Each structure stands twice: as C-alpha cells, then as structure tokens.
C-alpha cells in the first residue's frame, strides 16, 4: 500500500489545487482493490473523498444475457426511477462518523442486485459525482469505450496510469481491428434475446 498511497497523496494534492478529478487507470482488478483500500484508509484519516470502481459491462451484468434494453432486462427496466427512489448514490457513499464509504465493485453489484437495477449503469452514474474513479485502461484510452465524463471534459481530469509499461501493447490493440469468436457469440446471444432482432441473430448464427 505504500507506493500507491504515495502516488495518491501527490496526485490528490494536485487535483484539489487545480479543481480537477482523478482517473486511476489499471490493467488488473487486483490493483483496483489496492487503490480502493488505500483510498478508504485516507478517508478514515479525515480526507473528504468520493471514489468508485468500475468494471466491464459484461462482467458487471446481472442479467442472463447482456442485453441493455428495458424490454429484455429487468435490471434495466425502470433503472433511473429505482436508483432515485432507493437513494442508491447516498447509500453507497454513506458517511459513518464523518468518513465517506468507498464502495467496491462488489458493493455496487450487491446494491444493484437488491434494488434490481443495472450495476454498470449505476457505476457510470457514480463516475459523474466521484472525485476518484478507478478502472481499466479501456475507459480512458480506448476511444470506443471512454467514459462520458472524461470524453466530455478531458481537461477536468488527472490520469494516473498504473504499470504504464503495459499500456503500449493495449493501445496497439485498440488500433488493430479483430473479430473474436467470443464477440460473435456475445452478439448472437444479445440479439436473440430481443424479439425484433431475431432476424439479425439468425444471420450471425450462419457464421458462428
């Protein structure tokens, strides 16, 4: 935790001085957990900070099939109303003795399951209010996956790249088109779940 705490201390000072927010980009889930734990320790020392971790849509999804439409996913149906009615943002960032909770990916998933809302959409909404967002390289460096707050106002963010030596290979992958069988399978499953897209699913089935 020492190295991570040292990095966070310096970048938080810079962020507060310049009124910016922080995206902590990692290549591994294990490192995300270390950052979560470090921020929680800083919060317990009295630092007023809101942080959230995000994970990939397909890994976060609680539905049987990744199909983000209210007509085929009960977690997407009425999502925003349920989040507001159950005050999920406030609950996940609940203060105890003046210390703001730092919700883990599991905390977001559990709260989403209980409230029957989409955990991915919930984490994306939390990103808009967070001082620190912890997530994969993809959500800042991949133009097709960059999260809204960074895409809309890149100058308002400080980007911390953990294990930056891994970034060149990942970046080359962003610019190297490829179609994997798993992607085709995922597309087929998603389209098959939506009645109006069954015809498209049948076309994909021919090349599976």
Name these PLM-found stretches.
Residues 3-4, 24, 149, 153:
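Alpha-helix N-cap/helix-initiation motif
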Residues 33, 37, 115-132, 137-208:
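Signature of the SF2 helicase/ATPase Hel1-core->accessory helical subdomain module
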Residues 15, 42-46, 168-171, 195:
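A generic secondary-structure signal for well-formed alpha-helical elements
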Residues 19-133, 138-141, 184:
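A substrate-engagement module of RecA-like helicase motors
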Residues 16-18, 45, 153, 164:
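Secondary-structure transition/capping motifs at alpha-helix termini
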Residues 1-10:
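Walker A/P-loop
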Residues 10-14, 38:
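Hydrophobic residues on the short alpha-helix immediately C-terminal to a glycine-rich phosphate/catalytic loop
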